[in-house]
């Protein structure tokens, strides 16, 4: 949409890759982050010539793609001196945030799963084999050691709780608010956590957040509970999609 800026683009890199470039002088990225750029052939772990042609991206604009554990290069001597580092410090390609967290939590191999909560929330399911969700609800990415993963990502997760506490009820005392919740399994107030539209598994930018089921007896604690449960069940939506694909989670 901004051709005058696009014409000036020499290399396409993600933020961590730019840092690696400044350290080593090497234009690089890794397979996990490249998988989310819509220019990557995830199954074959290389740039997609077809997608690059469609998008008008030239091969020389793309960084060299590495496995996450591979050496990109060493810190340049002048950079090492400036930072007070030894010479020949090795820089690895690294990984995207969720992929790195998955390795740290042992989410590698077949049918392992972790959940990550931040502004957004993810369901991350590792696999030894490449797989595609034909309904386009879950994303297919390259993962560690030649493996792959499926990921469901909701746009508003812990940010829903922050919005509710900061903007609506005006307190940061999370423990006090949650201590008032006593109707586990009995609350009839529901919250749809689509404050910024939704990605997985609905792919609907026009989805909006909603409280449902309120009565004159509804308490603040009921609504706080509904926000927490709404996020949990929105994550479960992606989990149910994974199960419908025949995935049987081991953990």
Model regions and ranges:
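Gly/charged, well-structured mid-domain segments that form the phosphate/adenylate-handling core
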Residues: 71-75
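Active-site core segments that coordinate phosphate-bearing ligands/cofactors
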Residues: 1-29, 38-49, 53-54, 77-251
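A glycine-/small-polar-enriched, mobile loop at the entrance of the PLP active site in fold-type I
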Residues: 35-39, 60-70, 150
């Amino acid at each position: 949409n901004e051709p005058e800026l696009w014409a000036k683009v020499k290399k396409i890199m993600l933020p961590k890759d730019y840092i690696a470039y400044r350290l080593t002088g090497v234009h690089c990225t890794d397979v996990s982050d490249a998988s989310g750029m819509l220019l990557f052939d995830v199954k074959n772990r290389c740039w997609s010539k077809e997608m690059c042609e469609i998008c008008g991206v030239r091969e020389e604009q793309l960084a060299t793609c590495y496995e996450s554990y591979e050496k990109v290069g060493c810190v340049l001597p002048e950079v090492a001196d400036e930072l007070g580092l030894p010479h020949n410090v090795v820089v690895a390609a690294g990984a995207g945030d969720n992929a790195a967290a998955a390795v740290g939590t042992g989410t590698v191999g077949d049918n392992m799963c972790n959940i990550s909560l931040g502004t957004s929330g993810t369901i991350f399911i590792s696999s030894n084999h490449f797989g595609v969700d034909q309904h386009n609800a879950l994303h297919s990415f390259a993962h560690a050691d030649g493996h792959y993963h499926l990921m469901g990502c909701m746009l508003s997760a812990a940010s829903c709780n922050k919005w509710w506490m900061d903007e609506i009820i005006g307190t940061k005392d999370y423990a006090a608010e949650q201590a008032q919740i006593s109707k586990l399994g009995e609350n009839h107030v529901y919250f749809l956590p689509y404050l910024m539209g939704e990605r997985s598994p609905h792919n609907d930018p026009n989805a909006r957040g909603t409280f449902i089921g309120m009565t004159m007896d509804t308490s603040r604690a009921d609504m706080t509970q509904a926000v927490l449960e709404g996020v949990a069940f929105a994550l479960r939506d992606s989990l149910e999609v994974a199960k419908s694909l025949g995935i049987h989670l081991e953990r």
